[in-house]
């Protein structure tokens, strides 16, 4: 996927932003695969003097949901901090039994542009996220999913998100979901003579 944003922002700055994403999958077997991916949301370099007249921060408009940037939603709306975000990821998919699967994804998050916190440039490495999802298909309509995620912070992430320094170096998130996908069909009723 590749998107460009051009125009004028609400504060009359020129917009020159982009987003691109790519995935390459290698099938190990019929049920097992490895995927290498990269997502890039452009950002504005706040150490530059051009920030008064130009923004390079890509706006997702409504947020990308969980399609990009992991399940922990730390970067659900990357334009909040303005510096953009890069996500290098590796996903392992394993088929378990007849109807089960396990997916594990490791993300490496970095800032593509400089970010200033109190006038000091922040290191671009924000940390790593690990997402694990187990899916058990019960029948053709119902499945159960369970997920666990953890994020390993760097000092830069603490500065970017305004966390209190040295109050723990990771976060945890878990969830359980019942998925129902009914198959709805419409049959034409025959007229009887």
Predicted segment positions?
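Repeated loop/turn-to-beta-strand initiation elements of outer-membrane beta-barrel proteins
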Residues: 31-34, 98-104, 138-146, 184-189
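Outer-membrane beta-barrel "beta-signal"
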Residues: 168-193
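C-terminal structured "cap/appendage" subdomains that terminate the fold
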Residues: 130-152
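Extracellular/periplasmic loop regions
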Residues: 4-95, 101, 117, 159-161
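Transmembrane beta-strands of outer-membrane beta-barrel pores
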Residues: 1-6, 38-44, 77, 106-112, ...
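Outer membrane beta-barrel transmembrane domains
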Residues: 69-75, 103-129, 145
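Residues that define the transmembrane beta-barrel architecture of outer-membrane proteins
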Residues: 14-20, 84-88, 124-130, 168-174
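Membrane-embedded beta-strand positions of outer-membrane beta-barrel proteins
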Residues: 1, 24, 34-36, 92, ...
């Amino acid at each position: 996927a590749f998107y460009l944003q051009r125009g004028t922002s609400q504060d009359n700055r020129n917009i020159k932003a982009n987003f691109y994403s790519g995935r390459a999958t290698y099938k190990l077997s019929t049920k097992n695969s490895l995927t290498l991916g990269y997502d890039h949301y452009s950002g504005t370099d706040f150490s530059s003097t051009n920030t008064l007249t130009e923004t390079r921060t890509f706006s997702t408009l409504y947020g990308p949901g969980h399609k990009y940037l992991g399940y922990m939603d730390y970067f659900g709306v990357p334009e909040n901090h303005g510096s953009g975000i890069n996500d290098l990821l590796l996903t392992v998919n394993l088929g378990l039994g007849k109807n089960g699967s396990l997916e594990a994804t490791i993300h490496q998050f970095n800032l593509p542009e400089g970010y200033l916190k109190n006038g000091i440039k922040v290191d671009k490495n924000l940390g790593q996220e690990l997402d694990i999802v187990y899916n058990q298909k019960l029948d053709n309509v119902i499945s159960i999913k369970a997920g666990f995620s953890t994020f390993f912070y760097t000092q830069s992430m603490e500065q970017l998100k305004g966390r209190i320094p040295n109050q723990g170096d990771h976060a945890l998130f878990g969830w359980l979901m019942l998925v129902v996908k009914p198959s709805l069909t419409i049959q034409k009723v025959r007229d009887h003579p």
